[in-house]
Design a protein with these regions (language model features):
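Conserved Radical SAM active-site core
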Residues: 1-4, 17, 35-115, 120, ...
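N-terminal [4Fe-4S]-dependent radical SAM core
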Residues: 1-22, 31, 35-42, 168-169, ...
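Glycine-centered loop/turn positions within well-structured domains
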Residues: 28
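Short glycine-rich, flexible loops that bind phosphorylated cofactors or substrates
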Residues: 76, 140-141
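P-loop/Walker A phosphate-binding loop and immediately adjacent motor/lid segment at beta-alpha junctions
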Residues: 86-91, 142-182
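Short, conserved loop/helix-junction motifs that constitute active-site signature segments
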Residues: 124-127, 150
Length: 182
């Protein structure tokens, strides 16, 4: 796996100050994507144990609330194994920090049924996630007032509750969209 960039103080892709990993490789090719260079699986730098160590070091400060995975596409089959290794190490060291992921795949149609690579790896991956923002970016549904998502078709899914209840449960630990806020 390659990665496009790592942001160590991101406030746009989940609650609080976060570390964000932008992986390389995406087969969705959404029209209007803000990160088209990351569609190429060979873009950026190789993801290695040194990369994991760098991310873990960025997660040390108490003000960092967690890690966000974006892309590219973090759920492409070839990206899942390296990401799961990162999450294993992260949760062993920082169990209190949250993990968010953004995916153009749909949770209930593509991810949960195990259609994307090794189902055992996907299940382990899901076990580390707190929130999944699912669905492709749809330019016609773009709305800048939406919090933590680019288009209105995308859902903020509370992954632990969804897995426990066996149905999609939307994440509610937020303050609403920006419409009407002063």
């Amino acid at each position: 796996m390659n990665y496009a960039t790592i942001k160590n103080c991101d406030i746009a892709n989940g609650p609080g100050v976060r570390v964000s990993l932008f992986v390389s490789g995406c087969t969705h090719h959404c029209k209007g994507c803000f990160n088209q260079e990351a569609w190429d699986f060979h873009y950026g730098k190789p993801f290695t144990q040194a990369t994991i160590d760098r991310i873990l070091a960025m997660l040390v400060p108490g003000y960092i609330r967690g890690l966000t995975l974006l892309g590219g596409e973090p759920f492409e089959p070839e990206n899942q194994g390296p990401i799961v290794e990162l999450l294993r190490q992260m949760k062993a060291k920082f169990p209190e920090k949250s993990v968010w992921a953004f995916s153009g795949y749909l949770f209930d149609r593509d991810i949960l049924p195990g259609k994307l690579g090794d189902p055992a790896i996907t299940r382990e991956y899901l076990g580390y996630l707190d929130v999944l923002v699912d669905g492709p970016f749809v330019e016609a549904k773009k709305d800048l007032a939406l919090r933590f998502r680019g288009s209105s078709n995308q859902r903020l899914i509370d992954v632990p509750k969804t897995l426990k209840e066996g149905k999609i449960v939307l994440w509610e630990d937020w303050q609403g969209d920006l419409k009407g806020m002063k």
